[in-house]
Structures are given as structure tokens and as C-alpha cells.
Amino acid sequence: MASNENLPPNVIKQLAKELKSLDESPPDGIKVVVNDEDFSQICADIEGPVGTPYENGLFRMKLALSHDFPHSPPKGYFMTKIFHPNVASNGEICVNTLKKDWNPSLGLRHVLSVVRCLLIEPFPESALNEQAGKMLLENYDEYARHARLYTGIHAKPKPKFKTGAISESTTALNVGQTNNETPGAATAIPSSMTDIKRVTTSAQDQQHVANVVVAASASVVTTTQKREAGLAKVQADKKKVDARKKSLKRL
């Protein structure tokens, strides 16, 4: 694999300058993906131009720089599968800027812009994908349908998740829960099934004790009532005996 060691120091310095410029001021619809450890592989994400079959697609491509760059042109490849006359099945890009029209003074910005323009205006006369080239010349609607199908399947951008919104929602939920709590009050929440069983068992024990107390109280009341009734009967019988004794004395 090529690396910075395969490029002359002056070329690395120039590439670093160009990549910084591309990062700070990217071309329309192009974002360069920089790998500081390997300037010989320049990757970029290209947005499908509006009004073309590649619209709403995001295509990853790369420029492979040889050890004698910039005296020899880089090789361009689409890493995202695309249906295009000037892109071979292995992703290789055919455009004159990267072949006979190459000039060492051309920078990366120019090359990337040319590749994106190729999505706007293909050149079926120099097709690497013969099917796409023939279809473009004979039946544009069918060509566009195929290109849109490939775009929808292979070049669909990945969704971006708003982590900030999720954090804000979580914070709002926590604030709402805090506001509903009574200051100074502590609510014990069972943390496991064991705790729940303990709480349930405790409640059952308390209810059982309560039932026993009620039953015992009722028993005491009943016993007391019986004792009082028996005492009253004894007193009544004693009165009867005393009355009989008095009657006998009179006789």
C-alpha cells in the first residue's frame, strides 16, 4: 500500500497545502476526506448534482497518486457503485483530465470538480460502461431510470442523528420528574423482584398480625361478657337463697 513515504517531501508539502484549502473552502458539492498518514490516497464524497439521475446520492471516490505525481496523473475511482458511461465496473473513471489532458500544474480542486461535472455531462463516446453509454445515446429515459435505481440502492446518504435533541429530551424528562417530587420526601422503590417479595411479605405479615389482634380482642370481649353474665347470675341466685332464709326464719 502506498503511503507518504512513497511521495517526495516537496509533493507532500504541496498536497498538505491543497488539502487544507479544500477543507477550509470545499468546492460545491464536494467534501474531501483527509488521511494525514497517507496522502497518496485522496478520498472525497461527491453529492449528486441536482437535475441529474444522481440527485440525492452521495458518492465516495478516490484519487490514487503514484510515486512520480504530479508528473503523472492520478487514477480516479468511484468506490460507490454507480451506473455511468465513463465509470467501469471496477469503479475506474475515464476522463481526459486524468489522461491525455493532464498537466502537472492542475491541482486536486480542479480534478475533483471535473469528476463532479462528469455526473452532469457524461461522455458516451469514450464509455467504459458500454451498456450505459449505448443506453444514454439511444434511450435517455431508460438510462436515467437505471442511474436513479443505482443511486437509490448504493448511494443513499446515511441518516444523521441529533444527539443534542435526545439529550435535551432526557434532561427535560428528568426535570419534570424532579418537579413532581415533594421536597424532603423519599420514596422507596423496590429495585428487584426480591425487594418486591419482601415488601409483599411484610404487608401480608402486618395484615395477619392485625387479624390476630382483632380476633384476640373479640375473644377477650366475649370472655369478659361471659364472666359478667355469670357473676350476675351468681348474685341473683344468692339473693334468692337469702330471701328463702328470711322466709324460714319467719316460720
From Swiss-Prot:
The active site is at C94 (glycyl thioester intermediate). Residues 230-240 have a biased composition (Basic and acidic residues). Self-ubiquitinated. It comes from the Eukaryota. PROSITE patterns: UBC_1 (PS00183), UBC_2 (PS50127). Pfam families: UQ_con. SMART domains: UBCc. The keyword Ubl conjugation applies. Accepts the ubiquitin from the E1 complex and catalyzes its covalent attachment to other proteins. Belongs to the ubiquitin-conjugating enzyme family. This is Ubiquitin-conjugating enzyme E2 22. It comes from Arabidopsis thaliana.
